[in-house]
């Protein structure tokens, strides 16, 4: 074993999480290469992230420097063009940076931003920084309004205390029950399924003691390719009864459609949620709409908002505890349609409340349109328009389709 001098505290925790993810290296040389690749990748990512999150707050509204941040990637959904209401994902240590970049390009227009928190805001340092950024934004763009749609009541309270306009509206309301549903003709082949990207935060290793397990996984670039492939190899080596549902090309997991993901859910008896901290976790709602009971670890972020103790168990983050919880739910054998029905009752109530809020918002902004009585969002699959800030600003400025 190579000594890891100089690693302590949180860095040690991150190192252990990384090694749990990729597994033991085959040799000292391979281990060194993995660690070196990870260090280089993290350094580059941190530098890019720092630039991306700071630059939008520093640029002038007009002039040759105003478009320096035009290449930053972002996504949004246009809820209404007149009045202009935009649904925008935000997250990270400086959550308002995409609004700062897009807001400068829409400074002369009245805009309402509805923000979706992709990562929990229940973090004091992030809230404190965001409070200062909110004050800056209000002074810079007086025609704009930002409304935070919060995944938990605690998140709403913290954002409101920092000066934000916030309501409780968990983003898992956006998951489509038309796509994620029970499929009676699909036989159950796995005790559990885990839909989790390639990331140390997802703690895939906690599921390794489950006898029959399906993985749905993908990369968003959090790890260098050499480490991501090592992760895939580790999953493959666990057991002949563990399967990666994604197609693999040169050791790399390909993308599944939402319909294919739902089919994999229906091949499993239980859905897994194993991270300690993240956002509200779309897949937790996808499981429930497909009729799967859930085994979760204690978590921060809002995925437990729709949990029910009859079919959701929060277990300690230990392999044996996760396995036992899965076995308990297998024994309960709660019908899928029952889980789905009870979930949709909760979702339906909150959607009605949110539609009433949206109707009042549009009226306040000058709309003369009818009441919103049908759910106006198309589901998470394909809902977001993605592009650079420059492209998104041009798209938002297009006239209303006739």
What are these regions (language model features)?
Residues 91, 96-202:
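Catalytic core of nucleotide-activated saccharide and alditol-phosphate transferases
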Residues 173-258, 262:
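Conserved catalytic-core segment of nucleotide-activated headgroup transferases in glycan assembly
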Residues 317, 323, 330-391:
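A charged, aromatic-enriched C-terminal amphipathic alpha-helix characteristic of glycosyltransferases
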Residues 293-297:
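Short hydrophobic beta-strand element within catalytic cores of glycosyltransferases
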Residues 1-133, 299-302, 314-315, 364-372, ...:
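N-terminal pre-catalytic "stem/leader" segment of glycosyltransferase-like enzymes
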Residues 262, 284-289, 303-304:
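Short alpha-helical segment that forms part of, or immediately flanks, the ligand-binding pocket
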Residues 263-279:
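Acidic donor-binding loop of glycosyltransferase active sites
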């Amino acid at each position: 074993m190579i000594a890891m001098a100089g690693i302590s505290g949180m860095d040690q925790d991150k190192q252990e999480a990384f090694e749990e993810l990729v597994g033991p290296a085959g040799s000292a040389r391979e281990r060194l290469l993995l660690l070196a690749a990870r260090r280089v990748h993290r350094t580059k990512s941190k530098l890019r992230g720092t630039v991306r999150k700071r630059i939008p707050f520093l640029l002038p509204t007009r002039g040759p420097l105003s478009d320096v941040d035009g290449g930053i990637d972002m996504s949004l959904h246009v809820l209404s063009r007149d009045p202009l209401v935009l649904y925008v994902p935000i997250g990270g240590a400086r959550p308002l940076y995409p609004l700062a970049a897009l807001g400068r390009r829409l400074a002369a227009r009245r805009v309402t931003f509805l923000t979706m928190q992709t990562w929990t805001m229940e973090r004091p340092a992030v809230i404190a920084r965001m409070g200062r950024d909110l004050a800056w934004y209000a002074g810079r763009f007086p025609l704009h309004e930002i409304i935070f749609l919060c995944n938990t009541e605690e998140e709403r309270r913290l954002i409101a205390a920092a000066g934000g306009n916030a309501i409780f509206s968990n983003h898992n309301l956006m998951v489509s029950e038309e796509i994620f549903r029970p499929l009676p003709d699909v036989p159950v082949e796995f005790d559990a399924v885990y839909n989790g990207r390639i990331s140390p935060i997802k703690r895939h290793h906690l599921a390794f003691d489950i006898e029959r397990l399906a993985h749905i996984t993908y990369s968003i670039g959090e790890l260098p390719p050499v480490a991501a492939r090592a992760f895939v190899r580790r999953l493959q080596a666990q057991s002949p009864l563990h399967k990666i549902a994604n197609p693999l090309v040169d050791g790399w997991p390909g993308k599944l459609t939402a319909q294919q993901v739902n089919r994999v859910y229906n091949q499993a008896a239980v859905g897994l949620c194993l991270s300690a901290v993240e956002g509200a976790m779309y897949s937790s709602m996808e499981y429930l709409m497909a009729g799967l009971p859930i085994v979760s670890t204690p978590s921060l972020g809002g995925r437990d908002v729709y949990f029910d103790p009859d079919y959701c168990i929060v277990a300690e983050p230990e392999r044996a505890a996760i396995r036992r919880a899965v076995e308990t739910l297998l024994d309960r054998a709660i019908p899928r349609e029952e889980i789905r029905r009870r979930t949709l009752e909760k979702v339906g109530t909150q959607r009605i409340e949110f539609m009433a809020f949206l109707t009042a918002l549009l009226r306040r902004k000058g709309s003369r349109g009818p009441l919103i009585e049908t759910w106006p969002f198309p589901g998470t699959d394909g809902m977001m328009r993605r592009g650079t800030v420059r492209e998104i600003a041009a798209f938002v400025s297009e006239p209303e389709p006739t």
